[in-house]
């Protein structure tokens, strides 16, 4: 969730298609000197910079105080990182310039009787603040300062490519959450797992699940598409591991579009999570080094120690720029609040070593033309796995870790690999239109951990296995943003994507070697899902029209055609032969929205949008009896979701708030019914589904050094699995309980900041009472603490996760307490300490 001092319009907004782009700097613009001189109307404050470029600013006032935050700036002064002067001019009591945050310089101006006014301009020396006051002196009356014209001194305008074009956040007719670099770094002190960071900060998204996948983390009760710089990460039927495809250190900002959208294509029934990688620097050279350690505080067990290293290097040589980030993270083992080792499952993050490389190369051919190539590689390895999970008795209420050392042979160790290649070209004015073209390729490989048990859901297999999935995706986008005159524009274009999906096998393992020696040895393969091609072609157009100062309309459509092709017959695990074939589908989807400004501080929006996704073909092909591509058309039809949403946004001097309500419905939902008893087979139910909910956000700067805020997120949902008009609750895997977060921050000293943050997850037993869930979900609360202090030339950060050492099971883990997978009911970590130090040079 965004902080008030970093946002302009409001912290949550959007439209029915979205990616977010905003000019941002990997490090700050350096302020190397400060000059202050008295003028006829007050003072002129010169902040000397090497670039002379005016940064984005945010203003607020209280009492007789004016605060101006300069975003993406850093003080680099020989006299230290604070400048202050008392009574510099009549009517001005004090002036103070401080490094408020790692990327924010704050100018604080205090008047004697009135709030000073200030205009920010650029000069050859740097940034000039012309400060004046309405106070009059006896010798010479000061001229009355002119108030800024409407729009002249607006706060920062975060832009959202809601229609794949840049827009002011307050102009978007839907809910969007923007997570900036500072917030990402803040949460990364507690976890390097992106899914848990999103769970802490995004309304409508499931709470942190402490796993390497987003199971139990839907967005408004449905699956979200995840993009990296516009490259889609989710292929048809893929395991939800996409948040492991990039490290937080490689991210500049994240835009989350809440609710179905189709402008970026399919797989976005719940919305879009667009991850924007680190942006080029404006300095000739910048670098940041970070190291950190962590451990469980219960007993500082040796196995619990974690470590991380990060390095960022950026160059900018006129028309050429280069950005490189490297990060390494070793999680160690986890221990719960009772001092027990957390039971390791296939999805837990213990003993995980992660590497991430991001390289970005850009060339500006002219002021209007730019070519950029991005390479991102991520690798997860789980090593030294000397414990396995085992179901415990009901009294303990959790799975337990059982010692059992495993050694892997011949490429059988669990891992996740992902590679992204992305080429972008931009022409800002080609025949009157802004043109953007993109080509991308992605390769993903995943091998699961070997469980010390037999798979019970697939009786025909009858042996111990682990699974492998390997798929590739390539595609491209071409779009043009054309002005229509009269404050209106149209974005139009074409997308194409080809997925080499499926290709999943179970590795048959040597049972005797596993049981007697703990050796994981592959002795054969069992095909689970055949390789199939899934191609998509989309045409779209989106119109924006500002009717007047109060009313703005938007609307558009997308026509999508896709083809499923299974080239060879396939024998699935239940003994059925799936006949080869090809099937073509098409969908046309619409969106319509309006924004109305009730006043300068308050606006409202309403929208209708549609999203769609093909069902996970693997869930159909791998377990369905007597299935044929051409004959079972209804089972593989795309799921189309309609959503209606209304909302209010408010932006005052020191408060940002939002409130939205939504209802979405799909006539042909795709709900995987998981068996509750061993030996049963999962099935995919294609039936009507509905989801509804309310979301609220608040950020309040109480006074100069204190800030509070939080989010409230509640949703519910039902499915008519038998299509008889009798709806039953959706499972907790799809509908997460009430989520409430809150934070309190204090700037204790100019170089010292402290934060407490609370996560409360409510109970949910509605699905359990109607025999949908195998366990009720009990509520829990987690309190975290973070302290950041300037130390030497760098910054020291100390974080304590689960400060009160609360013993609990995450919601997704509680849902496994009963049923056929009780060994997956792992507890959360107890109190855990992290310490890291970063240095920019």
Residue ranges and their predicted role:
Residues 22-151:
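Signal-peptide-cleaved, periplasmic/extracellular N-terminal interaction regions immediately downstream
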Residues 207, 215-216, 231-258, 309-311:
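Short acidic/polar hinge/loop motifs at secondary-structure boundaries
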Residues 246-290:
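A beta-strand signature from Gram-negative outer-membrane beta-barrel systems
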Residues 290, 548-549, 562, 661-666, ...:
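Gram-negative outer-membrane beta-barrel transporters
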Residues 300-331, 336-385, 417-429, 484-485, ...:
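Transmembrane beta-barrel wall of Gram-negative outer-membrane proteins
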Residues 379-383, 387-392, 445, 500-502, ...:
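Surface-exposed extracellular loop regions of Gram-negative outer-membrane beta-barrel proteins
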Residues 424-426, 433-452, 597, 603-609, ...:
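Membrane-embedded beta-barrel scaffold of Gram-negative outer-membrane proteins
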Residues 612, 760-767, 788-841:
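C-terminal beta-signal and adjacent terminal beta-strands/loops
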